[in-house]
């Protein structure tokens, strides 16, 4: 089974595929041709770096295509009063009385250091469908579990997400 993705996640991945096929691929091939013409390939670092970059780009295209092909499309809308995808949630950790504001996102957008928690993570799974004030059991594994209380829920969207094209654009600039 593949990732659970929203329609917008897939749209952004398709944008990156198009960008990589029509922009990056052409530039990478030109770079390989140009560095190949510099002579002895056995000692031509630029040629080998250009080939590696071209192969990395092709690998990324295949990865994105495979991810989309195997994805399960999920709805990113939820009721105003319950936790769903793209909601910002403030939780209270009962064990130490600390609070944290997190955003529930699809796995492909998850970044726990930035407070973007995957719907497939123990915390994300536990919170989905719950309401403000609910005390929720989070099971990390059979030996580790803890409780959180939902303090607030904000219905947001994924407009804070950076386009996949822009996330990868710096790769191209570094190698061309």
Predicted regions, residues:
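Acidic, proline/serine/threonine- and glycine-rich low-complexity intrinsically disordered segments
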Residues: 161-163
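N-terminal cationic and glycine-rich segments that engage phosphates or anionic surfaces
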Residues: 2-59
């Amino acid at each position: 089974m593949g990732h659970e993705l929203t329609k917008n996640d897939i749209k952004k991945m398709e944008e990156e595929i198009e960008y990589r096929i029509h922009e990056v691929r052409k530039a990478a091939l030109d770079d390989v041709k140009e560095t190949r013409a510099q002579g002895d390939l056995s000692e031509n670092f630029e040629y080998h770096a250009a080939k590696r970059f071209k192969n990395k780009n092709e690998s990324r295209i295949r990865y994105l295509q495979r991810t989309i092909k195997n994805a399960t499309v999920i709805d990113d809308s939820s009721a105003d009063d319950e936790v769903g995808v793209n909601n910002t949630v403030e939780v209270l950790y009962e064990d130490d009385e600390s609070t944290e504001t997190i955003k529930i996102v699809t796995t492909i957008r998850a970044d726990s250091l930035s407070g973007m928690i995957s719907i497939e993570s123990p915390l994300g799974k536990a919170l989905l469908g719950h309401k403000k004030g609910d005390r929720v059991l989070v099971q990390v594994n059979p030996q580790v579990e803890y409780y959180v209380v939902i303090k607030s829920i904000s219905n947001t969207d994924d407009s804070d997400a950076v386009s996949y094209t822009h996330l990868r654009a710096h790769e191209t600039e570094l190698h061309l």
